Amino acid sequence: NTDLLQLRIERGTQPTGLLSRKGKEFVITMPAGLRLEDPRNQAWAQRVLTEALRRRAKEVLPPIVHEEAARFGLRYNRVYIKDVKSRWGSCSSLGNINLSLWLMLAPIDLVYYVVYHELAHLNEMNHSARFWAQLDAFYGEPGRGKFLESKMKAFALDLQRRNMP
C-alpha cells in the first residue's frame, strides 16, 4: 500500500482471477491453484497490477495536476496516464502532461514532485537554472527541487532492486 493506492491480494476459489474494487481498495483475487513461481502466472499478476495502477492513476493524477496548475496560474492542455517505465513524467511542447501509472507506487511527496517538475516545463522546456528556480519557487524553498530529484532517483533504484516496474 502507498499514499495513493490500497491493494490487497487474495487467494481465490474459482479457476479465473479477478480485479475488483471495495471502496478505495483494489482487490486482486488470484485464481485457485495459481502458483506465482510459474512465469505465465507472473505475467498475469503483472497485467492485473498494471490495470489497478492505471485505474487509480486516472482517478488521482489529473485532479492533482489541475489543482496545482490552477494554484500556480499555469495552463496545460491535457493529462495522459501511460504505462511508461523509463520516465515518471514528461511535458510536450503542446502543453500535454504525461504521467506514468507507476507513480502510484511512489510516496505522495514524490508524486507531487513529478507533477511540479512537469508543470515547471510549461515555462521552461529544459533543465536550465531557470527551470530549477521555477521548481524551487513552487515549493518556496531554494534547493528543494534538486533534493526531491535525488530522492526520486533513490526511490527508482529501490524499485529496480525489488524488480518493480
Predicted regions: what is each one?
Residues N1-Y112, L122-P165:
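Active-site-proximal or metal-binding-adjacent scaffold patches in catalytic folds
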Residues V115:
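Walker B beta-strand of ABC/ABC-like P-loop ATPase nucleotide-binding domains
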Residues E118:
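Walker B catalytic acidic pair
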